Amino acid sequence: MACHSALAAVPSSRLHFYAPRPPLSTSVCPFQTALLGQPLRIYSSGASIAAAASPRSMVVVAATKKAVAVLKGTSQVDGVVTLVQEDDGPTTVNVRITGLTPGLHGFHLHEYGDTTNGCISTGSHFNPNKLTHGAPMDVVRHAGDLGNIVANVDGLAEATIVDDQIPLSGSNSVVGRAFVVHELEDDLGKGGHELSLTTGNAGGRLACGVVGLTPV
C-alpha cells in the first residue's frame, strides 16, 4: 500500500507520535514530511508514527536595547543623546549638543528623571555604589561620571562614549534618569576644590533630558 494511503487508512484518533525505535516485527514504509524535513516511518501494527528528527542547534540572538534623551534648558543649549546596548554588554552613548560655549563641559547622568524644577530637580550624579566623583576610567567614580564633552567654535559638541556602568535594564538601569550638560569643565575629582569629589566642580546645569526607551 502506498504510504499516503496507509496514513489515510488509520483513524486520526489512533495516531500517535513517538521517538523510540520501532519493534523489529513491524512493517514500515518511508514517508517524507515537510514539517520536520526528516524521514518518518508509519507503523501499521500500532498505527503509530516514529520521527527520527536530528537535534537542532539553538541560535542565541543578542537582545538589543535602545533609548534616547532630548536635552532642553533655559539657555540656548539643547541636544539629543542616544543609547544602545547589546545584550548585557557596555552601553554606547552618542551625544550631540548645540549652543554651548567653546571648550570643555561636564557631562553626567543624574539620579532622577525629574525636571519639574528644571535641571536642578534631577538630583545628584547617579551613584548606586556610593563612591566619590571621578573620571570615567577610574575605579572609584560615580556610575554617572561620563567626563567632559568638547564644544567647537560653533558651540557644537559631538561625542561617542562606551561605558559599562550605565545599562538599559536591570537594577541599575539608567532608564528614567537624566543626562545633564554643565557650564564648566569637570575636574574629574582631581581639582582640589571642595566640590571636586562630589560634582567635579563643573558649575551650573545648562540643559538636561530624561532617558526613555525607544523601539529597536
From Swiss-Prot:
Q: How is the cofactor bound?
A: Binds 1 copper ion per subunit.
For this entry, the protein name equals: Superoxide dismutase [Cu-Zn], chloroplastic
Q: Which Pfam families match?
A: Sod_Cu
Give first and last residue of the transit peptide.
1-62
Top EC category = oxidoreductase
Q: Which domain of life is it from?
A: Eukaryota
Q: Record-annotated residues binding Zn(2+)?
A: H125, H133, H142, D145
The organism named in the record is Zantedeschia aethiopica
Disulfide bond residue pairs: C119-C208
Family affiliation: Belongs to the Cu-Zn superoxide dismutase family.
EC numbers, comma separated: 1.15.1.1
A GO CC annotation recorded here is: chloroplast
What does the record give as the reaction this protein catalyses?
A: 2 superoxide + 2 H(+) = H2O2 + O2
**Where is it located?**
Plastid, Chloroplast
Residue sites binding Cu cation per the record = H108, H110, H125, H182
Extract one GO molecular function annotation from the record: copper ion binding
- Describe, as the record does, how this protein assembles with itself and its partners: Homotetramer.
